A protein has these predicted regions:
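Short, positively charged, Gly/Tyr-enriched micro-motifs
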Residues: 82-154
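Short, conserved DNA-binding cores of transcription-related domains
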Residues: 1-92
Length: 154
């Protein structure tokens, strides 16, 4: 692990990166990309948490929704997959659930808005095979083609 979360103070996140350089420039660049992606994941995880609730009951259309507690979910970001514990709500009647974080952060399927935008742009230039390859080669992001196709439909 090369990216370490040092502090979260108000709107500021401080991280520390330790990157081992190589005698090969290409290898060094790959190591730098991986470290920056790791840092991006850590900071994006903190950014996503800011859109969550404190777990208090909420009213939607006059109906009371209560938190089922914090449940983990993986989100796709430009930097990698991030796991976030977030509150999921349900009415006393059961049925469908609601996640305020996903509404307020404008999550698309399970992608952050920036990642969804990147994927949409890449689809404008080619099919899912090319998008999958481009993300892996140019961004260090390995994403299943089936996920990309599902994201494209949204």
């Amino acid at each position: 692990m090369s990216a370490k979360l040092i502090a979260v103070e108000g709107d500021t996140v401080r991280i520390e990166l330790n990157i081992k350089l190589s005698r090969s420039m290409l290898e060094s660049e790959e190591t730098i990309l991986n470290a920056l992606n790791e840092a991006g994941c850590r900071v994006t995880g903190e950014a996503l948490k800011r859109f969550d609730t404190d777990g208090s009951a909420i009213l939607i259309g006059g109906t009371k929704w209560t938190s089922k507690g914090e449940e983990p979910k993986y989100y796709q970001t430009p930097y990698g997959e991030v796991e976030v514990l977030r509150h999921v709500y349900q009415t006393s009647a059961g049925g469908k659930t609601f996640c305020p974080l996903e509404r307020d952060a404008r999550i698309v399927v399970s992608s952050t808005p920036r990642f969804a935008k990147v994927v949409a742009h890449k689809f404008a230039c080619g099919g899912s095979t090319q998008v999958e390859s481009d993300l892996a080669e140019n961004h260090g992001r390995h994403v299943a083609r089936s996920y990309l196709q599902n994201l494209r439909k949204r």
